[in-house]
Amino acid sequence: MMSLDVYSEKYGLCRKIVGFPICLMSTTFKVYEVLGARMEGNTLLRRHQYDYAGDEIGRKIEQNKIRNQAQALRNIRRKTEYLKEGIQLLDDMQMQLEAELEYLEVMGIEGNAARIYFPRMFDNVQWNGRKPRIKNDYVNVTLDIGYTMLFNIVDAMLQVYGFDTYYGVFHKCFYMRKSLVCDIMEPMRPIVDYEIRKALNLGQCKAEDFDVYDQRWCLKYKKNPEYIQFLMKAILEYKDDIFLYVQQYYRYFMKRKSVEELPVFLLHKV
C-alpha cells in the first residue's frame, strides 16, 4: 500500500509534469480524482455562469436534442410509415424552437417530442414508455444506467474546465443536482437510446437479465459487466465529439457570443 508521503510526492510531480488533466474514473465513468492541470479557480467563467439568466441557450440545447432524436430514428434501417411520421413531427418541432420562446413553452415542446420519439425508438419491444428512475421495467433501468454513464463523462469534462456543474442554463438549480451536466448531456442522450435499441435486437438486453423486487427491476449483479461493456463502447465512440463539444461550449461561454454561435453536438449518421 502506498504511503501518504509517497502518494503526495507522486501527485505533486504529476501536477508539475503533466500539462493536461488525467481523470481517474470508476467503470461507469464516475470521477473520483483529477490529476494534473485543471481550472478549478476559473472565477471569470463562474461569474459569467452566475450572470446568465436567459432562456435562449436552453432553447438551443433542446433544439439540438430533438434534432439528434430525429437522426436516431433516421438511423433505423427499416422505416415504417409510423417511423417516418415521427421523424417529420420532430423536424417540425425543431423549427418551432427557432422562435424566441419562454421556458415553459420550450418544456412543452420537449415533452411532446419525447412522446413522439420514445415509442418509435423502442417499437421493437413491448414497452410502456419512458419513466426515469422508478425502475418499472428493464428498458427503463438500462436507459438509466446508460444515462448515468454519459452523465459521469460529461461531468468529468466540465470539471476540467472549471465550470460550476451545479449551475445550469436550462435545468433548474436544486440542492446537490448538477444541473449544468444535465443540460450539456441533453443532445447526447440519443447515443444511449440507439445503442439500447440495437442491444434489444441483438439479445444483449433482455428481461431475463433482471430481478424484480417489489415491482422494481434490478439488473443482476453478474450481468453488470456485459451491460457496462456495450454501453461504454457506444459512448466511447463519441469521446472526441463530446470533448470538442464541451471545449467549444467553454469558449463560447467565455467569449459570451451570440446564441446563434452555440456549438452543436451531432449524432453520427449510420
Residue spans of the language-model regions?
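Glycine/small-residue-rich interface belts in oligomeric ring/scaffold proteins
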Residues: 1-41
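Active-site helix-to-loop segments that bind/position phosphate- or nucleotide-bearing substrates
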Residues: 39-270
